[in-house]
């Protein structure tokens, strides 16, 4: 399993390409010309655009803590994408990414996944 975020991103892109050979994925590189918080991976699978914010799970770290590292700006962008009818969520590895893509292909905006869009914390900084 890849330990750094870039390794996780590469693993996700490879896995999506294997599962859906006609898919296209892009690694979104942040820059001064790009709005803050845009998810790390954009993929087009069977005509559906899916955004994935990637967090790597550090040794000894709980999944809840890893999801909690999603920044306020990243949560805001994920909410904007979902509000527009798009699919977006935070994932920790290629297995979660494939599951999220399958859910999105079934019509989900992935709103039930982290980050939450409602609740006591407003969806920011706490996993379900």
Sequence positions of predicted segments:
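Catalytic phosphate/metal-binding cores of nucleic-acid and nucleotide-processing enzymes, i.e., regions
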Residues: 1-128
